Amino acid sequence: MGKYFGTDGVRGVANTQLTPELAFKIGRVGGYVLTRHKQEGKPKVVIGRDTRISGQMLENALLAGLLSVGAEVVRLGVISTSGVAYLTRALGADAGVMISASHNPFPDNGIKFFGSNGFKLSDEVEAEVEQYLDAAEDTMPRPTGEQIGTVLEFLEGGQKYLSHLKSTVSERFDGLKVVLDCANGAVSSLAARLFADVDAEVITIGANPNGININDQCGSTHPERLVEEVLKHKADLGLSFDGDADRCIAVDNNGEIIDGDYIMAICARALKAKGKLNNNTVVTTVMANMGFFKGMEECSINTTKTAVGDRYVVEEMLRGGYNLGGEQSGHIVFLDYNTTGDGLLTGLQLLNIIKESGKPLSELKQVMVKYPQLLINVRVEDKSKLNGNEAIAQAIREVEEDLAGNGRVLVRPSGTEPIVRVMAEGPDAAQLEGLVNRIVDVVKQQLV
């Protein structure tokens, strides 16, 4: 991670950390670095945002920066991160930009870029952007006259994206009832339209954004209300998205939460059965539950692990020629259809598997059995001090000895927040609480 870029773009509290002035610079630098190869005509950049109150402020600042380097900007309005990634490619743009802080609370916001291929930027490109941001002098071009950039409104982009999603499934979903929790975020209007268009019976919650209620006790990080609604309506499936809808957490017909590990396992087995799982492999991260790996082994499906972050999952998928990967948090990547985690696409594929198999999600999830897992987030002053802290390392070693090879411990800094995550897995849920809290106590002593 760099000075500005975390694992998912630039983030901070809008108007204090992520200011309009910084957004202008990011637009100017990002627009230049990503489009300077353009030989003829103005470079094209698409831009979308979620529903945060600060989105319009940052969008206009970004726009000014992009226009100042001569870009033609296609404004999509409120749309998902995955919609921006798809439309960057579909519209032949040179770059894409999404304004969102994903699952973070509404005062935060963020900016992430996509290259012309729809993929997130590499560490190397982000490092170059940071060099320009920190340069003592702005040496980038300042076109004048007719070479100054222009803005094109393309609010039909959302419908174009939905048409693409519908083309990825062959089934119609009449007879299936789905509850959608839109997190008062980017797909508050798109999600219901998509699932109604494929004939599912749709019930929506968290679909009334007001600028400050995004992710507020709703969405993929708060699935409790979705569980209640699925049981209340006797639905076949519940789908919960985060603020920018690049992730999806499901709820089965019995009201049980189905996280990204389960979703990947279900989709991997379904793709393998059709002969469509590239290289018989699914890509996940170090956060995946031990039960996921055991379940895949029993299905004779290979797995490979990366660092946390869907960008690293995608890099490994491209390297190995794989088409399915994701994270426990619900970022699921179907590389045949999109270049990043896509909550709407994930939900649609799950519904398609339910319809094709004739089996409820509660039965499909039996492809794996989760090991008990406990995760505690500790808010700290400086997460960078985790590395090299001997007291914390010693606490981890002692807990690993207590698990005696029948479990695991993972302690890592968040890529997007001032948080250290302490996670342990093992066969005994009661034992885990004591083990994790031993490490948490040391983290608090050392870093808080």
Curated annotation (Swiss-Prot):
Cofactors: Mg(2+)
GO biological process: carbohydrate metabolic process; peptidoglycan biosynthetic process; UDP-N-acetylglucosamine biosynthetic process
EC number: 5.4.2.10
tRNA processing listed as a keyword: no
Keywords: Isomerase, Magnesium, Metal-binding, Phosphoprotein
Reactions it catalyzes: alpha-D-glucosamine 1-phosphate = D-glucosamine 6-phosphate
GO MF, one annotated term: phosphomannomutase activity
Processing after translation: Activated by phosphorylation.
GO cellular component: cytosol
Coiled coil: none
Cofactor note: Binds 1 Mg(2+) ion per subunit.
Active-site residues from the entry: 102
Binding site for Mg(2+): 102, 242, 244, 246
InterPro entries: A-D-PHexomutase_a/b/a-I, A-D-PHexomutase_a/b/a-I/II/III, A-D-PHexomutase_a/b/a-II, A-D-PHexomutase_a/b/a-III, A-D-PHexomutase_C, A-D-PHexomutase_C_sf, A-D-PHexomutase_CS, Alpha-D-phosphohexomutase_SF
Pfam families per UniProt: PGM_PMM_I, PGM_PMM_II, PGM_PMM_III, PGM_PMM_IV
Modified residues (Phosphoserine): 102
Known function: Catalyzes the conversion of glucosamine-6-phosphate to glucosamine-1-phosphate.
Family in the record: Belongs to the phosphohexose mutase family.
NCBIfam families found in the cross-reference section: glmM (TIGR01455), PRK10887.1 (NF008139)
Protein's recorded name: Phosphoglucosamine mutase
Origin species: Brevibacillus brevis (strain 47 / JCM 6285 / NBRC 100599)
